[in-house]
Curated annotation (Swiss-Prot):
Main location (coarse class): cytoplasm
GO molecular function annotations of the record: leucyl-tRNA--protein transferase activity
EC number of the protein: 2.3.2.6
UniProt-listed NCBIfam families: aat
Lineage: Bacteria, Pseudomonadati, Pseudomonadota, Gammaproteobacteria, Legionellales
Record carries keyword Transferase: yes
PANTHER family: LEUCYL/PHENYLALANYL-TRNA--PROTEIN TRANSFERASE (PTHR30098), LEUCYL_PHENYLALANYL-TRNA--PROTEIN TRANSFERASE (PTHR30098:SF2)
Organism whose genome encodes this protein: Legionella pneumophila (strain Paris)
Protein encoded by which gene: aat
Record-linked InterPro entries: Acyl_CoA_acyltransferase (IPR016181), Leu/Phe-tRNA_Trfase (IPR004616), Leu/Phe-tRNA_Trfase_C (IPR042203), Leu/Phe-tRNA_Trfase_N (IPR042221)
Protein name: Leucyl/phenylalanyl-tRNA--protein transferase
């Protein structure tokens, strides 16, 4: 399925050693969806052109392979309130100030605007963790087919982002989703069960999962 019929990205296999595939262009919702459908994602710093990446290797998390440590097991017993798609703009704004990739803010105002539009279109979703009335953790990403493409997560109290990821995995497993794309390998996510695969394998898995219809709309859980 072509999400942006006016533009097609280069073959991901032609990216450089760091995974950089293309530079520039406009960050529109349709173009972002087209990128994800080809195993590509935007990642760039404020003031710079849009950079489009397709790294090799790739990090994914199979929903039923999430690992729960002893400390996280204790945290999961706390009376958090778990919600989906009730505070998307707050979650992405928190992530913009609590970026996990670098110490710099990479979630630009342009990205916030585009992903908020994707949320309104039913493609971008947020998972929220509440301690009473306080938003203490969460994550957001894109859903296509039976795949969830994680973008960023945040926490204001210890392990709240891990609670959000566990929540995501539980929902994805119940909906028979195939994998969560974690993009770049990190020890933090690998300790939680994520695994490294080749780009070739990732692209094959992606094309298989895109055979399923997109689960669009405002998500909710009981």
């Amino acid at each position: 399925m072509a999400y942006d019929s006016d533009y097609t990205f280069p073959d991901p296999e032609t990216s450089d050693k760091q995974g950089l595939l293309a530079i520039g262009g406009v960050l529109t919702p349709k173009r972002v969806l087209q990128a994800y459908s080809q195993g590509i994602f935007p990642w760039y710093e404020p003031g710079n052109p849009v950079l489009w990446w397709s790294p090799n290797p790739r990090l994914i998390l199979i929903p039923n392979e999430f690992k729960i440590s002893r400390s996280l097991k204790k945290t999961l017993k706390k009376p958090f309130k778990l919600t989906v798609d009730t505070a998307f703009q707050r979650v992405i704004s928190y992530c913009a100030t609590c970026s996990d990739r670098t110490n710099k803010t990479w979630i630009t105002s342009e990205m916030i605007e585009t992903y908020t539009q994707l949320h309104e279109m039913g493609y971008a979703h947020s998972f929220e963790i509440w301690d009473g009335s306080e938003l203490v953790g969460g994550l957001y990403g894109i859903s296509l087919g039976h795949a969830f493409f994680g973008e960023s997560m945040f926490h204001t109290i210890t392990d709240a982002s891990k609670v959000a990821l566990h929540f995501l995995c539980s929902i994805m497993q119940s909906w028979n989703f195939d994998f969560i794309d974690c993009q770049l390998p990190t020890l933090h996510l690998m300790r939680l069960g994520a695994k490294i695969i080749s780009r070739k394998e990732f692209l094959h898995m992606l094309q298989e999962t895109l055979k399923y219809p997109d689960k669009k709309g405002n998500w909710s859980v009981d």
